[in-house]
Amino acid sequence: MFEIHPVKKVSVVIPVYNEQESLPELIRRTTTACESLGKEYEILLIDDGSSDNSAHILVEASQAENSHIVSILLNRNYGQHSAIMAGFSHVTGDLIITLDADLQNPPEEIPRLVAKADEGYDVVGTVRQNRQDSWFRKTASKMINRLIQRTTGKAMGDYGCMLRAYRRHIVDAMLHCHERSTFIPILANIFARRAIEIPVHHAEREYGESKYSFMRLINLMYDLVTCLTTTPLRMLSLLGSIIAIGGFSIAVLLVILRLTFGPQWAAEGVFMLFAVLFTFIGAQFIGMGLLGEYIGRIYTDVRARPRYFVQQVIRPSSKENE
């Protein structure tokens, strides 16, 4: 029987990248939600190398009177999950909640996650209801979720939703993992003894545009399999796929022509031989590309470069800056 420790302090970790329009509303609503908890709290906003005015807004928020905002400024853009890991390394709460800055997942859901964590769960995930994304984003998300479930064996419904709560020991365990590329929901579930998902509201994006373009989603899918971004090797795999599909299509066409018009249309089997050859060549390219992905991952991890570089940490005026 494990002792359930009540949540005493909540840390909200929010990565920010070019979100200057949504930041004032985000800070106001997140602060209001945290105040309603009746617990100690802090809000950590990580500027992931924004090129707009986001960093300046964060600094001003941290320096405001009675502020609970901790601003963490990275020197450049490292990506959503690396920015969150940077926030994890500075939290002081015993329950850590992650949240996107676009306000599509309302901060008002935070009390529900805290209440569920108080029931003894190590990880509280969320499933977006009535998603307000494009058809492409919804389809890509479903494909990624299925890929993760097949790869990890963890039957979670929505890995793409970053509105999640983690107990402190889960975050500490993740910080001890040193791989270069990290997908936090998967990593957390590796260490969680008890995990659960709850449905949450999903709103339309009011400010700016999604930071996940088509190519970023493709990269994310590859990273989930190999935990590395190596674009040239991926292009090799793509080339192999095209060749393999082309060879298979030719083979099907030749079979149809042979059955319909006789053996002379298939050049007495010569074209069929080429079709099979192209199929196998394509398969070899795919294998070489995937092998290259893993070799590239090993190379990157061996260099042991840090996931991110924190340029400055600005805490509320009552505390010293780092």
Swiss-Prot record:
Arranged from A to Z, the UniProt key words for this protein are: Antibiotic resistance, Cell inner membrane, Cell membrane, Glycosyltransferase, Lipid A biosynthesis, Lipid biosynthesis, Lipid metabolism, Lipopolysaccharide biosynthesis, Membrane, Transferase, Transmembrane, Transmembrane helix
Q: In which pathway does it act?
A: Glycolipid biosynthesis; 4-amino-4-deoxy-alpha-L-arabinose undecaprenyl phosphate biosynthesis; 4-amino-4-deoxy-alpha-L-arabinose undecaprenyl phosphate from UDP-4-deoxy-4-formamido-beta-L-arabinose and undecaprenyl phosphate: step 1/2; Bacterial outer membrane biogenesis; lipopolysaccharide biosynthesis
- Per the UniProt entry, the Enzyme Commission number(s) are 2.4.2.53
Which intervals lie on the Cytoplasmic side per UniProt? Answer: 1-235, 291-322
Q: Name one GO cellular component term.
A: plasma membrane
Enumerate the subcellular locations listed in this protein's record, separating them with semicolons: Cell inner membrane
- Which superkingdom? Bacteria
Residue ranges crossing the lipid bilayer per the database entry: 236-256, 270-290
Name the GO terms of the biological process aspect. Answer: 4-amino-4-deoxy-alpha-L-arabinopyranosyl undecaprenyl phosphate biosynthetic process; lipid A biosynthetic process; lipopolysaccharide biosynthetic process; response to antibiotic
Q: Which residues lie on this side of the membrane: Periplasmic?
A: 257-269
UniProt key word NADP: no
Q: Does the keyword Transferase apply?
A: yes
GO MF, one term, reads: phosphotransferase activity, for other substituted phosphate groups
Pfam families xrefs: Glycos_transf_2 (PF00535)
UniProt catalytic activity: UDP-4-deoxy-4-formamido-beta-L-arabinose + di-trans,octa-cis-undecaprenyl phosphate = 4-deoxy-4-formamido-alpha-L-arabinopyranosyl di-trans,octa-cis-undecaprenyl phosphate + UDP
Principal subcellular localization: membrane
The record's annotation in InterPro entries points to: ArnC_tfrase, Glyco_trans_2-like, Glycosyltransferase_2, Nucleotide-diphossugar_trans
How does the UniProt record describe the way this protein sits in the membrane? Multi-pass membrane protein
- Top EC class per UniProt? transferase
Q: What does this protein do?
A: Catalyzes the transfer of 4-deoxy-4-formamido-L-arabinose from UDP to undecaprenyl phosphate. The modified arabinose is attached to lipid A and is required for resistance to polymyxin and cationic antimicrobial peptides.
Q: Which family does it belong to?
A: Belongs to the glycosyltransferase 2 family.
Could you identify this protein by its name?
Undecaprenyl-phosphate 4-deoxy-4-formamido-L-arabinose transferase
Question: What organism does this protein naturally occur in?
Answer: Escherichia coli O157:H7
Q: Which gene encodes it?
A: arnC
